Amino acid sequence: MAAPAPRLISVFSSPQELGASLAQLVVQQAACCLADAGARFTLGLSGGSLVSMLARELPAAAAPAGPASLARWTLGFCDERLVPFEHAESTYGLYRTHLLSKLPIFDSQVITINPALPVEEAAEDYAKKLRQAFQGDSIPVFDLLILGVGPDGHTCSLFPDHPLLQEREKIVAPISDSPKPPPQRVTLTLPVLNAARTVIYVATGEGKAAILKRILEDKEENPLPAALVQPSAGKLCWFLDEAAARLLTVPFEKHSTL
């Protein structure tokens, strides 16, 4: 069994400082990936509070790179709710409105689900699109995945004690019984999450403190979904604000612009 990915925990004094640093890291990762002619940068996005955080910080951070650089980005989604893109619960819809409208990124650069399909077919269709975008990879290898973590320890649409945690064959799985609405979703599976070159978890607020202590410090017999993300050949980073990190006793790096 491969050794767990090296883990870096960074703690910021506020969500605003965290967001600014996250945006800079995305841009730096992109620049490293695009240093070779003909290369591209592949980014997997999650929803929730990450949408507003990236919408606030990423356009300005990415502006110096220019449209030619951003034209070499490919975006996908770590999970998605099976609702129309115009629906308030659509992760892609929210990013399209609040972030992508501010960036010179074309629809052809964004890999989305087809929300008109039944959930099983939507998962198969999204998997097919990913395989087309990541030709040559038996499992899609994203340069960077940005993940959130729920107060129950879920990440993407992988929930505690759910059978999808055992999925090893599919790269995308349907879920029809999500404990968090809406119930029908499409999610990347653990093999894809663990194939990424870099994974960044983002968590803010005191409401995440207890679950983060379990994920980052406890050795549980039945690990929470977020604790199962251990990139086999990549980096694992945690970006937390002080409120979310308040119960941690493990070493972490403290960041502040004050």
UniProtKB/Swiss-Prot annotation:
The modification Phosphoserine is found at residue 49. GO terms for biological process: carbohydrate metabolic process; pentose-phosphate shunt, oxidative branch. It catalyses: 6-phospho-D-glucono-1,5-lactone + H2O = 6-phospho-D-gluconate + H(+). InterPro entries: 6-phosphogluconolactonase_DevB, Glc/Gal-6P_isomerase, NagB/RpiA_transferase-like, PGLS. GO terms for cellular component: cytosol. It is found in: Cytoplasm. Pathway: Carbohydrate degradation; pentose phosphate pathway; D-ribulose 5-phosphate from D-glucose 6-phosphate (oxidative stage): step 2/3. It is an enzyme of class 3 (hydrolase). Gene3D superfamilies: 3.40.50.1360. This is 6-phosphogluconolactonase. It comes from Bos taurus (Bovine).
